[in-house]
């Protein structure tokens, strides 16, 4: 008899839902009715029930909690399966698809606003919860796929919003295409002709496992007119916003990483400097404005500036470990515009100082070890002694006994491998000092490469 009244009351609620024309009306289910009960007792959700039971999620949705479920009916499942059977969907995939319809908090229709929320599905590589893009401009639309048809079916462990389509797991391309803040990025990445990279495929492939640093529309506007930028250069700029691996914000640390952009015609990936001292910034020019937009195949961090291709100067100025070097190259040597010289990306310069540049960059500690820093007339040749022109000499090019091409000062350097104290290699400078240790290598810029050294090198004093 109790079940009879329970089902009769439920039927009355369903009739009320079907006849309701005001989307703001809230439908209340008896306090004893859980989300799982509602699905179980409503024949139009039998496909959803079967999926929940198969994955064990019916148990979770029958217990205590504060859930929001976007519930597809049978017609939505039929359309999604497109002639296949629910049994054809692998268990793990089905569970993630179902989780993609569930929020861990109770959100009524009035609580939902245009933007991102997290559901309880997870991205495979990072374990982070997947994002969901809600658009409330005209009703409630989820990930551009599924529209809420009946909102606010209240239960004792959350709320159900009936939706007209199953919500597939989103890819990075899903969010770039849907979020109006990324409309310029979407246009540039998917409509520019002449690219060798198919960005649509890169951002939509199930196994991408990438991090996209996505400039918003304002970032592109600040960059200025890009109509004159070649397709090859523009492609590299876009690739400079993509990192291998799904790197959520909590996994980022202050360090160098690599992007998918490459140096010249080589396969050497460009470096990117990540600084997490105050928020997250890249190459000292672009800050994360919204982190962790997690897709099924990677993560997006929205950034406020386009990350242009770095020069060796970019890294020197971005990395605080080189602040004394930067001061030496600028404030202490005003007669030589080192910043402009080392920012060059084209050859054929009248002074014969041409990229690529190989820079052996002393740390702040290296400068601190000096008794004093010479005046400009003495400092300029010292700085020139740290740069090789017209050569991108990477660590793989170094060998024991190698004598490098002459530095911009004139003297060559001699390489010793292995280095002392665990260093990658040692250098002997023009003055014969053989204890200069290379402690980090291959910070690859678009116009050269930086290797970090622990001492300031000195040219031959007799030159």
State what each model feature region is.
Residues 4-7, 20-463:
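Mature, structured domains of secreted/extracytosolic soluble proteins
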